[in-house]
Regions:
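Metallocofactor- and cofactor-centric catalytic cores in central/energy metabolism, strongly enriched
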Residues: 1-140
Length: 140
């Protein structure tokens, strides 16, 4: 199943979009089918990977590009041992204040580690991935 069901139609609408930050007239992807599948096992039997769109990156590394019209399709791989104080946020489209005060507001690493310790989930992956909060071109 394709993530974007009609990519050519979407690309045409995206090309006509002005690119204003308020997303006025943004050409949202319109799908009939959802590209998700139900779980086939109980959570304690599963390993969990975390992907966040908070735009997080480790202090001292390259932030996401928020100036590109298409957005930034890159990602940062962040070990779960990295402390919240060592994270920065390249944010566009949301105010990062809440996540700066408590990363679990958008990146629930600490809660998921507690779930792992209490056997609610099987195992949390050793790294998690952060992608940009600014990726208006869904075809990237």
């Amino acid at each position: 199943m394709d993530i974007i069901e009609n990519p050519d139609k979407y690309s045409k609408r995206f090309s006509a979009w002005r690119g204003d930050e308020r997303l006025s007239g943004y050409p949202w992807v319109e799908n009939v089918h959802a590209p998700l599948a139900p779980l086939k096992r109980a959570l304690p039997m599963l390993n969990l990977g975390l992907i966040s769109i908070a735009g997080a990156y480790i202090d001292g590394t390259e932030p996401f590009d928020l100036e590109s019209r298409d957005g930034d399709s890159g990602f940062h791989e962040i070990p779960v041992e990295v402390e919240a104080a060592d994270l920065r946020y390249a944010a566009k489209g949301y105010d990062p204040k809440a996540v700066q005060q408590d990363r679990n507001a958008q990146i629930p690493v600490d809660r998921l580690l507690q779930y792992e310790a209490n056997a609610v989930i099987g195992k949390l992956n050793e790294v998690w991935w952060s992608v940009s909060s600014w990726t208006p071109n869904a075809r990237l």
